Amino acid sequence: MLNEFPIFDYEDIQLIPNKCVIKSRAEADTSVTLGNHTFKLPVVPANMQTILDENVAEQLAKGGYFYIMHRFDEAGRIPFIKRMHDQGLIASISVGVKDYEYDFVRQLKADAPEYITIDIAHGHADSVISMIQHIKKELPDTFVIAGNVGTPEAVRELENAGADATKVGIGPGKVCITKVKTGFGTGGWQLAALRWCAKAARKPIIADGGIRTHGDIAKSIRFGASMIMIGSLFAGHIESPGKTIEVDGEQFKEYYGSASQYQKGAYKNVEGKRILLPAKGHLQDTLTEMEQDLQSAISYAGGRQVADLKHVDYVIVKNSIWNGDASH
């Protein structure tokens, strides 16, 4: 029962160091395998319209990073798969659960993507289970990620239906207001929810939402994530698709949630909001910094690779990791 677990979030946790066994952090290996492919980092930019487009997806794939293309340009998905495969790159797309998506999946038989993510806000649903089974029947070699969920029961059901990985997180993201609009979600206890779900999982878990710092990547791995989906930290780059807006001489990029009025059109029910982020530099600079910070984390863990982070001790320090840092 959940009540037996301590409830905490990223800012409540500090990992405890072990003796370092490498001469330099550069020796630490940050790569991770998901399905039949190995990627440079255990992170994936959120499959949102303001985070990536086809060009960013291509840049990520060429660089050896995992990506998931969003599902908001439905007609462009088959040409996108062809574009990626023509270059010898992996194709990784998203689908919903509407009736027409069943026909779409059948159309993929001629050129199946390596990864499909079934992407709906409340993934513990009969509609998702049915779509997992359909994809597995039509495209048995495609790696299926299903979500989003927030309970061990959901993880087990989706895995049993055939999902190869589950995505955990209901509304913890910076531009997600599901928790406010509905009263439901993992906002404020996403890391504890990840731990709870990971204990039940037999297959990889992708932690989705609530990441505010690079240290949160290491914490996610400690509590059971194989891959971490990140939105706001990847938003606002020069390559990001969001509009660039100038305010008082400063450049900002817009960033909005996947069920916001900006993405859905003004009159649909919304569970996302729009914010402006100061424009950042190049995406590759952020990826490199993430890699270096994760290498440092692995060295603090006394390890050589990502999996070594799973075994470190931790303490719960209620909301105090910013103590003594006046800038937060």
Swiss-Prot record:
This is GMP reductase. The keyword Oxidoreductase applies. GO terms for cellular component: cytosol; GMP reductase complex. InterPro entries: Aldolase_TIM, GMP_reductase, GuaC_type_2, IMP_DH/GMP_Rdtase_CS, IMP_DH_GMPRt. The active site is at C176. It comes from the Bacteria. Keywords: NADP, Oxidoreductase. One of its GO terms (biological process) is purine nucleotide metabolic process. NADP(+) binds at residues 205-228. Belongs to the IMPDH/GMPR family. GuaC type 2 subfamily. It comes from Streptococcus pneumoniae (strain P1031). It catalyses: IMP + NH4(+) + NADP(+) = GMP + NADPH + 2 H(+). Catalyzes the irreversible NADPH-dependent deamination of GMP to IMP. It functions in the conversion of nucleobase, nucleoside and nucleotide derivatives of G to A nucleotides, and in maintaining the intracellular balance of A and G nucleotides.
